[in-house]
Amino acid sequence: MENKTKRIKPLFVVDLLMALLGAASAYTGVEIHYAGHFQEHSAWHGWSVVHVVINVAWLIVCFLHCKHHWAWYKSLFKGMPSCSRKSKITLIVNFLFAATAFTGIGLLLFAEGQGTHLGLHHYVIGIALTALCLGHFIKRFSILRKGLRRK
């Protein structure tokens, strides 16, 4: 007897995880910023630990996401004659993600606590990333919703 149940494609699970972890990253990032201004250092530290754990998971899922879309990345290096508006925004999202990741890693390796200039840059770049990721997600939400349905 043939198994008729369809499985959800891993691509859509990865996309859903990207959205959930991205939202969690943004939330904990704002909590860190708030705690740095209005709460004790222990609250700032606690949110920082949660933020790092979430973002390590997000980074892993991001690599899986990029692997699924590797053909798009390869097309960039083959010299597309004209980059569409959608591709330009996706490129900016990629650039902001990399900038946020590198500043975050820099904070982990070199910062001595809260209130650093690098931390402020990380926060501002993270806000820009969040705004563009939200638009990126909204544009593709119907595709994700259809892909997550079992048929």
Language-model features: where?
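Membrane-embedded alpha-helical bundles that constitute the cytochrome b-like, heme-associated redox core
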Residues: 1-151
